[in-house]
Amino acid sequence: RDSNVTILPLRNMKD
């Protein structure tokens, strides 16, 4: 679950 929360912000930066 913690991994998912870290990917959320990462994906926003990529967009």
Swiss-Prot record:
Glycosylated residue positions: N4
EC annotation from Swiss-Prot or TrEMBL: 3.4.23.-
Top-rank taxon, per record: Eukaryota
Enzyme class, broadest EC rank: hydrolase
Tissue spec. comment: Highly expressed in the placenta between day 60 and day 100 of gestation.
Keyword Hydrolase: yes
UniProt entry keywords in alphabetical sequence: Aspartyl protease, Glycoprotein, Hydrolase, Protease
Signal sequence region: none
GO biological process assignments: proteolysis
Keyword Cell cycle: no
GO molecular function: aspartic-type endopeptidase activity
Family: Belongs to the peptidase A1 family.
Protein name in the entry: Pregnancy-associated glycoprotein 66e
Organism in which the protein naturally occurs: Ovis aries (Sheep)
